A protein has these predicted regions:
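Short linear sequence motifs
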Residues: 46-47, 89, 93
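Short cysteine/histidine-rich metal-coordination sites, predominantly Zn2+-binding motifs
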Residues: 83-91, 107-115
Length: 133
């Protein structure tokens, strides 16, 4: 089985056996460089054909969430790498307008008030953003 990691805009694909990724990278998968992210801004990724997630940079913090709105199970973005409100102060679901705190993933407005986005573990080392196991 191969894992395909795809960056929405550049369509960069990383193919490898999941066990080899764990062994070769100590459980961490490189996503992108911190310097390549807009601040504040987001970037979407896909593992295989189904699992979507995104990362948000806010100052020197990087947070990640599964790209599924808890309201209807739809992806949050309406356009590649667009996950934030116009003012870039909240994560926005483009389907029904729910807004989420960047730091916690908690819905603070819209149809899923009080529910939270599913977080993913990330780490930043030497300016590299990685999925952490």
């Amino acid at each position: 089985m191969e894992t395909h990691l795809q960056n929405g805009k550049n369509k960069t694909v990383i193919k490898s056996n999941p066990k080899e990724v764990h062994q070769d990278l100590g459980g961490n998968t490189f996503l992108c460089h911190l310097k390549d992210m807009v601040n504040p801004g987001g970037k979407g990724f896909r593992v295989g054909r189904r699992e979507r997630f995104f990362i948000i940079r806010k100052d020197n913090k990087v947070l990640g969430y599964i790209n599924i709105c808890p309201h209807q199970g739809t992806p949050l973005d309406w356009k590649d790498d667009v996950f934030l409100t116009f003012k870039k102060d909240y994560i926005l679901c483009a389907t029904h307008g729910a807004v989420f705190e960047i730091e916690t993933g908690e819905c603070v407005g819209g149809p899923c008030l009080g529910r939270i986005l599913v977080p993913i573990k990330l780490k930043v080392e030497n300016g590299k953003i990685m999925l952490a196991c």
